[in-house]
Amino acid sequence: MEEYNDGLRRFLLNLTLGDAALTDDLAQETFIKVYISLRSYQGIARFRTWLYRIAYNEFYMYVRRRRESGEDERGYGNVADTVSPYDADDASMDVERCLKVLSEAERTAVLLFYLDDRPIKEIADIMQMPQGTVKSHLSRAKAKMAKLF
């Protein structure tokens, strides 16, 4: 599991928009679920894909619980929490602000494709959606981020 720790934490840190404490909690929950479910791993997908899917599900469940309780102050996955081009400090736009304009699905696709160098097929497996949908999310994400500049 040690070989997957850094990549998984980086993935979760980006999903949580830099919230280190939440990242630690989600990573711990992910590894606990993996340990408990290890016998059910069938080997159909690569282990890393299975691990990231569990992590993504943990994040998604966290977001859903926050929304249901009305506590989603960070706006995880909330496209309404967008940044206008006029809010940018000169020409430097940091990654966190770029990620905030994306929906949860777009952000996940971007992180997996550009930061983790995952192929489209693996991203589709992790996100449980067709490859064409992943490509659409990436395309929309690029368009949204381009508007910021």
For the regions a protein language model found, what residue spans apply to each?
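Amphipathic, Lys/Arg- and hydrophobic-enriched alpha-helical face
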Residues: 1-20, 37, 99
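Residues within the DNA-recognition helix of helix-turn-helix
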Residues: 4, 137-140
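Short, charged helix-capping/linker segments at alpha-helix termini
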Residues: 10-29, 131, 148
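Structural recognition of an alpha-helix C-terminal capping motif at a helix-to-coil junction
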Residues: 25-32, 45-57
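Arg/Lys-rich amphipathic alpha helix in sigma70-family domain 2
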Residues: 36, 40-43, 53-73, 88
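Internal acidic/polar
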Residues: 61, 68-95, 99, 119
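Short, Lys/Arg-enriched C-terminal cap helix and immediately downstream tail that follows
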Residues: 64, 139-149
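A short pre-motif secondary-structure segment
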Residues: 109-113
